[in-house]
From Swiss-Prot:
Cofactor needs: Mg(2+)
SUPFAM superfamilies per the UniProt record, alphabetical: Class II aaRS and biotin synthetases, Nucleic acid-binding proteins
UniProt GO cellular component terms: cytosol
Superkingdom assignment: Bacteria
Record text on cofactor binding: Binds 3 Mg(2+) ions per subunit.
One family name in Pfam for this protein: tRNA_anti-codon
Protein name (database record): Lysine--tRNA ligase
PROSITE patterns: AA_TRNA_LIGASE_II
Species assigned in the record: Agrobacterium fabrum (strain C58 / ATCC 33970) (Agrobacterium tumefaciens (strain C58))
């Protein structure tokens, strides 16, 4: 290689242009600046583990090959820190130990470049594990400057738009996404240990259902038909339960809802949904508690988790409270003593709540719960006995036909889980779904259709079952101390830059 010192003095002062000029020089001098393959003998973490016991100011004589991105460079490249996904190692280049060809490459290396290094392992007098460079290989020339390492990417929107920079510069962000992966793996292991079979159901559906939400609509050119990104996998998972493939099934996958964006809502989000034959919602409560406790211990070694300045305990059993009782305690309104929709609306208005003129008894109850009770549910809690009006897939509570065996799990005032004793009476299921369809059409949801294939499956006979859906992103927020859902989704929904 020719000497590059004099050539680099004439480079442009613009940082990006300097890098492009260096790239051009490197192409002339070494040819391929982006080689297809590089063999390293150890990751940086493996290197640190293997040589953890060597003392300061000791040279091992062992030759290793590592690779990583340059995060810092001092004394004209004499000292460089390179990072791979597992950690960092210091690289030392000196005329006494580093051949001229390798030293001549140093002026061409910028922060952010990815290099490979072969050399002898030693520990410095200050105790830093170091490789004395004997060969340096340019693996990737970065054409853009790195974010300032010690301050990271402080612009919140930029962090979401350019997540690669966020993770490159912010150790907290990197750790959070590593934890996300660990949580997802933990959910799978837990469900499999509980005897559940993981299945996959359609993301593209001809009839959307299983939840009340606006779908994303598309068109299949070959089949010449409208299709929808699923809003929930529920109806297909129940059809799987009918099939007898397994008495316990679950799915971890994306749902899509064409609705608002907030710190707790993203149009594309991850759910874990499961169905357990011959179980009811009481069994599912226990399942939720065991799952949350298992994940907290796996991630933090304890059930006590810090979230935004408060301690949340995931130690079961969680508090359980029927919705009518919670509303009565918060407002004094005894919904169980109210007999008609008109009386419910009048009681709500008398207490200062703005309810719609056509709302039912159950809709009034649920609305007041959301307004007055949700915000108080900081520690993990199960809210039970939901109104049947808003729960078309759940069994009635014996002796109280206006309520159903449904619960939602709350934490930090957020709903993180929703579960039923699943309705399996085919005639009652059809009646409720027809009623739900009529209500949707009255709201102007003309695309909403009756899922006849699901109803046919229920006619075949579905065993009694408990069903559960968990908002995985919100659960990850709680377990990783993330204030926004966009902090735990690698590439969250955002407006176009021009907007």
């Amino acid at each position: 290689m020719t000497d590059t010192k004099t050539e680099t003095t004439a480079l442009s002062s613009d940082a990006t242009e300097v890098r492009r000029q260096k790239l051009a020089l490197l192409r002339e001098q070494i040819g391929d600046v982006y080689p297809a393959h590089f063999h390293r003998t150890l990751s940086n973490a493996e290197l640190a583990e293997k040589y953890a016991d060597i003392e300061a100011d000791v040279e091992t004589g062992d030759t290793v090959t590592v690779a990583g991105r340059v995060y810092s460079s001092r004394n004209s490249g004499m000292f460089m820190d390179i990072h791979d996904a597992s950690g960092k190692v210091q690289i030392f280049s000196h005329k006494d130990t580093t051949p001229e060809a390798a030293r001549n490459l140093l002026p061409m290396i910028d922060i952010g470049d990815i290099i490979g290094v072969t050399g002898k392992v030693r520990r410095t007098k200050r105790g830093e594990l170091t490789i004395n460079a004997e060969e340096i290989t340019m693996l990737t020339k970065s054409l853009l400057p790195m974010p300032e390492k010690w301050h990271g990417v402080s612009d919140i929107e930029l962090r979401y738009r350019k997540r690669h920079l966020d993770i490159l510069a912010n150790e907290d962000s990197k750790l959070r996404f590593l934890q996300r992966s660990k949580i997802l793996s933990g959910i799978r292991r837990f469900m499999e240990a509980e005897g559940f079979l993981e299945v996959e159901t359609p993301m593209l559906q001809t009839v959307y259902g299983g939840a009340t939400a606006d779908p994303f609509k598309t068109f299949h050119n070959t089949l010449k038909m409208d299709m929808y990104l699923r809003i929930a996998p529920e109806l297909f998972l129940k059809r799987t339960l009918v099939s007898g493939l397994s008495d316990k099934v679950f799915e971890i996958n994306r749902n899509f809802r064409n609705e608002g964006v907030s710190t707790r809502h993203n149009p594309e989000f991850t759910m874990m949904e499961c169905y357990w034959a011959y179980a009811d919602y009481e069994d599912i409560m226990g399942l939720v508690e065991r799952l949350f406790e298992t994940l907290a211990i796996a991630l933090h070694g304890t059930t006590e988790v810090e979230f935004q300045g408060q301690t949340i305990s995931f130690k079961g059993p969680f508090k359980r409270v029927p919705m009518p009782d919670a509303v009565k305690e918060a407002t004094g309104i005894d919904f169980l003593a109210i007999k008609t929709d008109e009386e419910a609306r009048a009681a709500a208005k008398a207490a200062g709540f703005a309810v719609e003129k056509d709302w039912t008894w159950g809709e009034c109850l649920a609305f007041i719960f959301e307004e007055k009770v949700e915000a108080t549910l900081i520690q993990p809690s199960h809210v039970t006995h939901f109104p049947k009006d808003i729960s078309p897939f759940a069994k009635e509570v014996p002796g109280e036909p206006r309520l159903v065996e449904r619960f939602e799990s709350y934490c930090n005032a957020w709903e993180v889980g929703n579960a039923f004793s699943e309705l399996n009476d085919p005639e009652e299921q059809r009646r409720r779904m027809v009623e739900q369809l009529e209500q949707a059409h009255a709201r102007g949801e003309k695309d909403k259709q009756l899922d006849d294939e699901f109803l046919d499956a229920i006619d075949q006979g579905m065993p009694p079952a408990g069903g559960l859906g968990i908002g995985v992103d919100r659960l990850i927020m709680l377990l990783t101390n993330a204030p926004s859902i966009r902090d735990v989704i690698l590439f969250p929904a955002r407006r176009n830059k021009a907007d």
